């Protein structure tokens, strides 16, 4: 998605709406043991005037029949924690990051 980097707030909003409109399809196709994790490689404020990344946090939304609701993970030390958590879900272990899958499921 290039809208945030291009500071195109209208395009950014429309792209998010389009993505959101497809979520019911994904949810309908999910099996009982599937977990959907939606995240980003960094946070970004598309209204910021500069061209660099801003200091917003990277989002993480988790959905699945086994997912616990209302979990506050606090501020993590590294974005690698998300990668480690996804790897844990598949029974893998990465060399960086502290997984938190046990807090989500």
Q: Predicted segments — roles?
A:
Residues 1-105:
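Feature captures the catalytic ectodomains and active-site-proximal regions of enzymes
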């Amino acid at each position: 998605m290039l809208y945030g980097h291009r500071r195109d707030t209208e395009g950014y909003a429309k792209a998010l709406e389009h993505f959101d409109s497809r979520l019911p399809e994904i949810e309908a196709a999910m099996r009982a043991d599937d977990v959907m994790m939606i995240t980003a490689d960094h946070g970004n404020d598309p209204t910021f005037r500069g061209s660099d990344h801003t200091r917003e946090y990277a989002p993480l939304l988790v959905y699945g029949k086994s997912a616990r609701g209302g979990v506050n993970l606090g501020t993590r030390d590294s974005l690698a924690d998300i990668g480690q958590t996804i790897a844990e879900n598949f029974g893998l272990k990465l060399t960086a990051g502290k997984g938190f899958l046990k807090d989500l499921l």
